[in-house]
UniProtKB/Swiss-Prot annotation:
Record's keyword terms, sorted: Repeat
Family assignment from sequence similarity: Belongs to the PPR family. P subfamily.
Key word ATP-binding present: no
Taxonomic placement: Eukaryota, Viridiplantae, Streptophyta, Embryophyta, Tracheophyta
Stated name of the protein: Pentatricopeptide repeat-containing protein At5g62370
Keyword field contains DNA-binding: no
Pfam families tied to this protein: PPR, PPR_2, PPR_3
Length: 982
């Protein structure tokens, strides 16, 4: 090592090399030493050739020989002696020689010495490095782990129009692959290829596999010709498989099968894993015909069938609502001697619960004959718990939950998520503490501490989480997901972020579920306003978003009507090799449909199909609703027929949407046809369908028929849930609030609908008092029955309070509020807004103000608007103006009705300048006052000789495309023209 450095030092010294011919007398003495150190006759002849070429003035040829000798040197000392020999013989080294020396030093494990040589002898002597030197420095800098500098040198070579060597190009591409920067690596490959160079085969293979593994399908296909040209034979089987799995990952099942067949033609064996993977893709695309064809092909070829194959097919059928076919595959599985496992039962139990057949799902759970004990599987329990809850069996759901915990099963964050849906709000941290105690007890084997005092519950939850983290990092990640969900449901994202940071410091890797909860909360709190702020937060959190993250982001962006940003998310996913899900497209289509942008919704639906993403039932239903909502009945009907054809047997969800949709569109006959098909398929109308129909007929004023349907639910053993009660009560309260009784809109065909819904029992009797549905006594009677029938949640409590208020029973409303709070249910903004509105209608504005100021909640637009309108009704314009300013400081603008009410109040009070400012505020928000209020204000301004302001308002009216009211227009124009000066 010291000898090598000493020899290299000779080149670092600043010395001028002569270019004149040296005397022949000097040659023997110099050459003798060199020849004595030479390794053989070949090297001696090369050195002699260098001298001869130098003497003849053929310096470029001499330097080429020098470069080749350096490249062929077996040690640093040999390379250094050759270079020294050349300089001593008057041949100055050029860039190619310097490049060869740098490369040789690096190859021999001296990249640091090579860099020093480059800095002193090349840069230090003012030599502009050419492509040869830069190419060698790429090699050197990669070895020094200074990749950015190496990449910059390679870019300089390419920019100068030269071709980098395969070595340097392959090193840079390899390092990019090490950093998972496969798209950059492919771009580098393309640039090098364009310059006439390339990569080594090993590097091409690595890049190809990386592109395939990360879903960059187009780029991987772009490399195929290069790989085939390099191998000059069929692709190796591992590259075939990489491309095959890439096709599957991107949802290109047809292309994957074509490659699949090509492999078999080339004589490669296609294994069971590849068959199963392709089958899974066909199932994802709802193409069960092709999936079954693959299954039969596997049977023909005598593959050993395993649970994964059957689970894939069962899940495919169950997902489409084809439960009978799924059950047939389950029977085939048992018949062929393949043992079902926990995933088999998880799929089947989840599917039957989703379809509402929870009793059969429970029988499967209890009587399972699989190879694994599913009675200890948390996912099966969670599906059953949620299934019973959805069906209205709250007691059964709670019993199952307690049995699960008592049996020592460790709950997870999904269990907690279901728990939040089941139990009253505002106790999220208490529920989280129960789950954490179970994780500590059942998962970590540690008896949790008994917590009697629930004060400062956040500290206790954090203590439990810390105990779990010290015992098991994986369970700690689950516990963290539970806690972040609890905190985010309370909008406490700061505490959630703090918990994540602390757990990371304890060595816990948070689940994506934790980050996704925080991302959603940040959107809801308007912390994330655009994509730039989203990117910053993701970078700060240092996590890789998954598909669920992108779905949350798209949903929140669509709620803000920022569809351009939502489409940008899809583009970003595709660039990263991620395939946007059908749920992401459905969210955008639904948002467009609500805005009446049907053409754009159609284009998005078409784009989804072009991307190879097959719509599921929900996507079809969203598109059908978009057509129906916007009066495109023919298109809706065509799509309905396509759904029925495509899904063979639609699910209960699909039938529910179709039947209720046709009834709402007034197409009762069509609704009855699909109800018949639903019954023929063995599916029963569920609580969702009944509730939708009840809501529709209530809006039409047909209370008798609505109550008939409500009673029929009980006769058909369909338990009324919270939403059914809320729908019924809300319809009654709307009727009571109307000044004039609404005429019942008779819809032909409803009796046919009723007859189909009646099964075996006689029609339920209708209460005699139903005709007096608008009376206060009837309202109290209904509320009493509801309170006896179901344990209300917060939303039903609010509906009941609305009923008391509508009946003028404020005292009873407050009594109900008090009992609700004793049950541990915390009132929300809606509760207080209902009471405020009732006080205002009762003529008690002061109590409404006290309620507004006494609430601990941050007011929203509805609460502000309710009080603002009340102040205007009580002719308190200055208080109303002050409230509007408070709203605007909070970042909330009044809605159009509130602005109109305030404008009327200000005009009535002759506060014209304040009214002018309100109109200008409205115009800035693209809200235009009604012509009557606008005209009234202009008239008052003219009367007060404030013609400048009157003309300004007149200009705003013209800008909005409206005109003054005809009754006052001539007089107003005359007054405006009396003074021409603005």
């Amino acid at each position: 090592m010291l000898k090598a450095k000493a020899l290299c030092y000779r080149f670092f010294k600043s010395r001028k090399a002569t270019t004149c011919a040296l005397s022949s007398e000097l040659f023997p003495s110099t050459s003798a030493a060199v020849f004595s150190a030479a390794s053989g006759d070949h090297r001696s002849r090369c050195l002699s050739l260098i001298v001869k070429l130098g003497r003849r003035g053929l310096l470029d040829s001499a330097r080429e020989v020098i470069r080749r000798v350096i490249d062929g040197s077996s040690s640093i000392s040999e390379a250094a002696l050759v270079a020294d020999f050349a300089v001593d013989n008057g041949i100055e080294l050029d860039s190619s020689c310097y490049g060869a020396l740098i490369r040789k030093l690096t190859e021999m494990g001296q990249p640091g010495v090579a860099e020093t040589f480059y800095n002193q002898r090349v840069i230090g002597n003012g030599i502009v490095p050419d492509s040869s030197v830069l190419d060698s420095m790429v090699f050197c800098l990669v070895k020094l782990r200074r990749f950015d500098e190496a990449r910059a040198h390679l870019d300089r070579i390419i920019a100068s129009g030269y071709a980098p060597s395969r070595n340097s190009s392959s090193l840079v591409v390899d390092e990019l692959c090490n950093q998972d920067r496969f798209l950059e690596a492919f771009h580098c490959f393309e640039q090098v290829k364009e310059r006439g160079s390339g990569l080594w085969l090993w590097c091409c293979k690595r890049l190809f596999k990386g592109l395939c593994g990360h879903g960059h399908l187009n780029e991987a296909i772009g490399m195929l010709d290069t790989l085939c040209g390099m191998t000059r034979m069929p692709l190796p089987v591992n590259l075939y498989k990489s491309l095959f799995y890439c096709f599957c990952k991107r949802g290109c099942a047809a292309e994957a099968e074509a490659l699949f067949d090509h492999m078999e033609v080339d004589g490669y064996y296609v294994d069971k894993v590849m068959y199963t993977c392709l089958m899974k893709e066909y199932c994802k695309d709802n193409n069960m015909t092709m999936a079954m064809r693959l299954y039969l092909r596997m049977v023909e070829r005598s593959f050993e069938l395993d649970p994964c194959i059957f689970n894939t097919l069962i899940h495919g059928f169950m997902k489409l609502g084809m439960l009978d076919k799924g059950r047939v595959m389950f029977s085939q599985m048992i018949k062929k001697g393949v043992q079902s496992n926990v995933f088999t039962y998880h799929i089947m139990i989840g599917s039957y619960c989703k379809e509402g057949n929870v009793d059969y799902a429970l029988r499967l759970f209890v009587n399972n004959t699989g190879s694994e004990d599913i009675s200890r599987n948390v996912h099966c329990y969670t599906n059953l718990i949620f299934g019973f809850y959805k069906k209205g069996g709250m007691d059964k759901a709670v019993d199952l939950l307690m049995r699960m915990l008592d049996n020592g099963i460790v709950p997870d964050h999904i269990t907690y998520f279901v728990l939040l849906k089941m139990l009253p709000k505002c106790h999220e941290l208490k529920y989280a503490m129960v789950i954490l105690q179970s994780i500590l007890d059942n998962g970590c084997g540690i008896n949790p501490p008994v917590i009697d005092d629930l004060g400062n519950i956040e500290v206790k939850v954090e203590s439990l989480l810390g105990e779990i983290a010290r015992k098991d990092a994986n369970l700690a990640a689950v516990g963290l997901a539970v806690v972040t969900t609890a905190l985010c449901s309370q909008r406490n994202y700061i505490a959630a972020l703090s918990r994540i940071e602390k757990m990371v410091n304890l060595g816990c890797t948070p689940l994506p579920f934790s980050y996704n909860s925080v991302i959603k909360c940040l959107f809801q709190e308007n912390i994330i306003e655009d994509l730039a702020s989203l990117v910053n937060i993701i970078q700060e959190l240092d996590f890789v978003p998954d598909v669920d993250t992108y779905l949350i982001v798209v949903n929140e962006l669509c709620k803000k009507n920022d569809r351009d940003a939502a489409f940008a998310i899809i583009d970003a996913m595709e660039e990263l090799g991620l395939r946007p899900t059908v749920a992401i497209y459905s969210s955008i289509i639904g948002s467009l449909g609500k805005q009446g942008r049907v053409v754009e919704a159609e284009e998005t639906f078409a784009k989804m199909l072009e991307s190879g993403i097959q719509p599921d039932e929900i996507a079809y239903m969203i598109m059908i609703n978009t057509y129906a909502r916007n009066g495109r009945i023919d298109e809706a009907n065509e799509l309905v027929e396509e759904v029925v054809k495509h899904f063979l047997r639609p699910s209960s969800f699909t039938y529910t949407v179709l039947i209720s949709g046709f009834v709402k569109m007034g197409m009762m006959e069509k609704g009855c046809q699909y109800l018949d098909k639903m019954l023929e398929d063995g599916l029963s109308p569920n609580v969702v369908l009944y509730t939708a129909l009840i809501g529709h007929f209530l809006k039409k004023g047909d209370f008798k028929f609505s109550f008939t349907l409500f009673g029929l639910m009980g006769e058909n053993d369909i338990k009324h849930d919270h939403i059914a009660y809320i729908t019924l009560l809300s319809g009654l309260w709307r009727a009571m609030a109307r000044k004039k009784k609404r005429q019942v809109i008779v819809e032909p065909g409803k009796e046919k609908l009723l007859q189909r819904l009646i099964r075996t029992k006689p029609l339920v009797s209708i209460p005699s008092s139903l005709g007096n549905y608008g009376s206060k006594s009837f309202a109290m009677e209904v509320i009493g029955k509801v309170k006896k029938s179901i344990i209300p949640n917060l939303y039903l409590h609010n509906t009941i309070i609305t009923g008391y208020c509508a009946a003028g029973r404020l005292d009873e409303a407050y009594n109900h509020l008090e009992s609700m709070q004793k049950e541990g249910i915390v009132p929300n903004l809606v509760t207080y807004t209902i009471l405020m509105k009732s006080h205002i209608e009762a003529g008690d504005i002061e109590s409404a103000i006290d309620l507004f100021e006494g609430t601990n909640c941050e007011p929203d637009q509805v609460m502000y608007s309710t009080l603002l309108k009340g102040l205007c009704d009580f002719k308190r314009p200055l208080d109303a103006l002050a409230l509007m300013l408070e709203m605007q400081k909070s970042g909330i603008n009044p809605n159009k009705d509130s602005y109109e009410k305030l404008l009327q109040c200000l005009c009535y009070s002759r506060l014209t300048m304040e009214a002018v400012k309100v109109v200008k505020d409205m115009a800035a928000l693209d809200i235009w006052p009604r012509s009557i209020n606008h005209t009234w204000l202009i008239y008052i301004l003219c009367e007060e000789k404030k013609l400048r302001e009157a003309r300004a308002l007149f200009a705003i009216m013209v800008q909005s495309g409206r005109s003054l009211l005809n009754c006052t227009k001539p007089g107003l124009l005359k007054m405006l023209n009396q003074n021409q000066q603005l």
